[in-house]
Amino acid sequence: EGNLKATTNDNIEGMMTTFGLPLGGKYYWEVTQTGWAGSNGDDLRIGVNTLTQPDFQNNRGGSDTAYSLASYSGKKDILGTYSAYGTPVRTGDVIGVAVDRVNHTIQFYHNGSGDGTFSIASTGDLFPWIGVGGGFNNSITLMNFGQDSSFAGQSGLDGSSANASDDNGIGDFYDTPPSGFLAVCSS
């Protein structure tokens, strides 16, 4: 899985990339949960974080520094403020993340269907990130930046992968990236 699988079984965990998303670009990646009991207290958050590395003493780069989708509720979380947004995420769903650093928006795609955009920071660093809330349920989450639409051969997906690439023909995605958004990987 190349450090793209996060297994958590403890209170408040997180994972983020070592690379930021530069201003002036449009980026796409996918996330799936292959194991998770799910409850409001265990909410998986998917999105981008403003920290340059997680604060592992204080909620692993928590929602107060992130723009994310709160998976259990389907709410958007803008720097710790929640509001209505989309559909709750369940095990086996594929969530596409489209970050637009030109127009400063983020949009989440639930099994290929967009949930609408909301604004993100127009300056500073943003890092792809996932975080698991305060419960103790086991969670297995995989990230696909264009390297493998099967998420390392995970079972439980619906099997309808598009094996899609971005507009430059780069990447292997489960769902088709939105036009103009590029893989966060090289060919």
Regions found by a protein language model. Give the residues of each.
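PRY/SPRY (B30.2) beta-sandwich protein-interaction domains
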Residues: 1-187
